Amino acid sequence: MKTIAVEQAVFTSTDRGPIKGYQLVAKSAGIDRRLEQELSRWSPTRGFRDRPVDWSLNCFPVFEDLTAITRTTLGGPEYSGRGGTQIVTLILVLRSDQLEAYDFNPITLAQTAMALGLLKLPLDLNCEQLAPALLPADPLIQNRCSHRDDAARSEAQILSQIAALVAEGRRAAVVGPVDPIATADRLIHSLPVESRRDFSFTTGLEPSLSRPFVVHFLSHASAAVQRTLDAQNVVCLNASA
């Protein structure tokens, strides 16, 4: 099987070294200082407040020719011993030509990576130097969107609204009881390939000025989250309506 080598990194809290707190604690050799700073900017230091979700899949472009596909999950207790839970973000970084083999669909690539044990805990977080991650040059997961079920059909209107907003260069948040992975997958398949190159989304991270995702998927939005979305001119779409 032909494979591709992609860069990988881990962002979490640590008390190792002169700087304590959240940072890239492990990375492969191709991640330089500039890329490290950008990956750190997009990676959260707070978890899934007031929500039952314990992990999130995220994707965002990095510079002109790179895309990061990340999975944020809960780790063990934080080193501070104050009772907090460690947030861990597992990161893969791909060139455009590598992602093109997956039709610029980060969901397909993430599912393939997870099937091979990547983007998952446990990792040896004491190892600062990681080898590049090896992935199939072509996806292992077939397109599951060709057969649309009743749930998918019921989301057709909201998917159409999101696609229209994306085409206008606007941002959106889907709030309500949807399957975020499946809905994001259907949305990506509905977008032209050229629109997928710079598309970004998160299936669970709360909005932040440092993480301007094009589309958020949120199970619900508290008053504080709603204010943040409004301040960033993010259009909220109610999936329960």
Give residue ranges: language-model regions.
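Extended, helix-rich scaffolding/adaptor regions
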Residues: 1-143, 179, 195-201, 205-209, ...
